Amino acid sequence: MLRTSTLFTRRVQPSLFSRNILRLQSTAAIPKTQKGVIFYENKGKLHYKDIPVPEPKPNEILINVKYSGVCHTDLHAWHGDWPLPVKLPLVGGHEGAGVVVKLGSNVKGWKVGDLAGIKWLNGSCMTCEFCESGHESNCPDADLSGYTHDGSFQQFATADAIQAAKIQQGTDLAEVAPILCAGVTVYKALKEADLKAGDWVAISGAAGGLGSLAVQYATAMGYRVLGIDAGEEKEKLFKKLGGEVFIDFTKTKNMVSDIQEATKGGPHGVINVSVSEAAISLSTEYVRPCGTVVLVGLPANAYVKSEVFSHVVKSINIKGSYVGNRADTREALDFFSRGLIKSPIKIVGLSELPKVYDLMEKGKILGRYVVDTSK
């Protein structure tokens, strides 16, 4: 029986409870085939079809994926426009939330029926200097969900038992799915900005899948939030999520001066989640002296440009932030479990994934799309 409340479990509304109880029924009988979306070449047709159910390796768990968030990285994996080679054929997806249905022979700490999350980092060696220092994402042998390892755009997927995220019973799996990548990523980026309560942080791309969560995490961490995006709909969402000042880049005549005026000297930190090369470089101009620019979004073949004299005289920092480790994941999920983060999601069937990619390519995504693997 699914528990609806524990000491640290987020309250589950009756409708959400009903949705979960229907989706979390017995998974004892594991089928041989399943529905999934697979492509055989970059930018090739996205096939929604029957594919084999994978068998977990000794160190892996098999997860019956109920919902999966759709991330801009999934689009890059399909396009093949990053310098990192992608596995082909490939099942994308790396924000999968579901139920553990089978354990590999060496797995400890998990049991069938547990709720689990599939992250971007599917597995790492856990023995190199990066893994030992908490930088598992930088492991040279990192295995990446939906990129080098078939991901969560299928009904059953495998994940390394050490890296898989533990999700509390009673959690709405549709809403928690985006936290597994988008939430963890922006939470870690905010930590990298090294801010204190009351500081200003600018979120570039504030109303997209990453930005909408970054606004909430920043607010929950006690920061004042300035959002940069375009359009009235996005401004309304930004304000609804707790943002304070919104800058519409299509309307402002001088973004640098407008941002610096609104924040009385510039934000102490900037989180770049947009995929605009120009926006990234501009952030080095409006950030406050001694402030930190954090790079998160990954536009293909892009460079960040910072004028050297100003960079030195203003003593600004430019840092890259790449998802998060297991501790970051636990912390990000805890914010969600305490009701401090709401995922602004739209649920569609897995079969509609090509339509979601089309919207993403056109820049028409508001919040986060989540696919239901049963449809």
From Swiss-Prot:
Cofactor note: Binds 2 Zn(2+) ions per subunit.
Cofactors required: Zn(2+)
Coiled coil: none
A single GO cellular-component term on record: cytoplasm
CDD domains given in the database record: CAD3
Top EC category: oxidoreductase
Positions bound to Zn(2+) 1: C71, H94, E95, C181
Sequence positions that bind NAD(+): H72, T73, H76, G208, G209, L210, D229, K234, F249, V296, S321, V323, R368
SMART domains linked: PKS_ER
Locations listed in the record: Mitochondrion matrix; Mitochondrion inner membrane
Transit pept. (range): 1-24
Keywords: Membrane, Metal-binding, Mitochondrion, Mitochondrion inner membrane, NAD, Oxidoreductase, Transit peptide, Zinc
E.C. code: 1.1.1.1
Reactions it catalyzes: a primary alcohol + NAD(+) = an aldehyde + NADH + H(+); a secondary alcohol + NAD(+) = a ketone + NADH + H(+); ethanol + NAD(+) = acetaldehyde + NADH + H(+); butan-1-ol + NAD(+) = butanal + NADH + H(+)
Gene Ontology terms, MF aspect: alcohol dehydrogenase (NAD+) activity; butanol dehydrogenase (NAD+) activity; ethanol dehydrogenase (NAD+) activity; zinc ion binding
InterPro entries the record matches: ADH-like_C, ADH-like_N, ADH_Zn_CS, GroES-like_sf, NAD(P)-bd_dom_sf, PKS_ER
Keyword hit for Oxidoreductase: yes
Binding sites annotated in the UniProt record for Zn(2+) 2: C125, C128, C131, C139
UniProt entry tagged with the keyword Transmembrane helix: no
A biological-process GO annotation: amino acid catabolic process to alcohol via Ehrlich pathway
Purpose of the protein: Mitochondrial isozyme that reduces acetaldehyde to ethanol during the fermentation of glucose. Involved in the shuttling of mitochondrial reducing equivalents to the cytosol, where the redox balance is restored by NADH dehydrogenases on the external side of the mitochondrial inner membrane. Shows a high affinity for alcohols with a double bond conjugated to the alcohol group.
Miscellaneous information on this protein: Present with 11600 molecules/cell in log phase SD medium.
Protein name as annotated: Alcohol dehydrogenase 3, mitochondrial
Gene: ADH3
